[in-house]
């Protein structure tokens, strides 16, 4: 009976380790103040209390630069075969790179903007260093 208990303990330990690794391998990056980047399918979302999605920068997010109060997102919108529920209008089509600026404090989103528009936007706010080394 002692041998059976040892086998149970070993199996339970292995199961716990597997669950821990699966749970830790999630493709979510918490960006602070309720913002999350999801690697798959590649979008940024802000969640209100509970599980209510407040806004979403739809796929595909190519890179982002995150600070405590701001978030700069480089995005290439994808066309889906199904209807995409997004409030954003892409004035130059979906084959263009766009940028979004998120003020986490006020939870406001500026974008989609072209690179030149984003440079002007950030210079007006003395934040042009955010474009350097955009992840």
Residue ranges and their predicted role:
Residues 44, 69-71, 79, 99, ...:
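Hydrophobic residues embedded in beta-strands of well-ordered beta-sheets
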Residues 51-57, 79-84, 106-111:
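Short, surface-exposed beta-strand/loop "edge" segments at domain boundaries and coil↔beta transitions
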Residues 79-100:
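Structural motif
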Residues 75, 101-102:
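Short beta-strand element of the conserved SAM-dependent methyltransferase core
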Residues 4, 29-30, 105:
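Intrinsically disordered, low-complexity regions of eukaryotic proteins
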Residues 103-135:
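C-terminal partner/receptor-binding element of secreted or periplasmic proteins
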Residues 9-70, 74-76, 88-89, 129-133:
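N-terminal export/targeting and maturation segments
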Residues 1-8:
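Positively charged n-region of N-terminal signal peptides that target proteins for export
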């Amino acid at each position: 009976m002692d041998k059976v208990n040892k086998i149970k303990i070993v199996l339970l330990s292995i199961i716990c380790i597997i669950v821990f690794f699966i749970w830790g391998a999630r493709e979510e990056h918490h960006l602070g103040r309720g913002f999350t980047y999801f690697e798959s399918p590649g979008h940024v979302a802000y969640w209100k209390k509970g599980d209510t999605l407040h806004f979403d920068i739809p796929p595909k997010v190519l890179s982002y630069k995150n600070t405590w109060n701001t978030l700069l997102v480089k995005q290439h919108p994808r066309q889906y075969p199904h209807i995409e529920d997004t409030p954003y209008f892409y004035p130059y089509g979906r084959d263009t790179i766009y940028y979004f600026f998120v003020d986490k404090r006020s939870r406001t989103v500026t974008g989609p903007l072209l690179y030149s528009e984003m440079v002007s936007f950030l210079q007006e706010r003395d934040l042009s260093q955010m474009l350097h080394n955009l992840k």
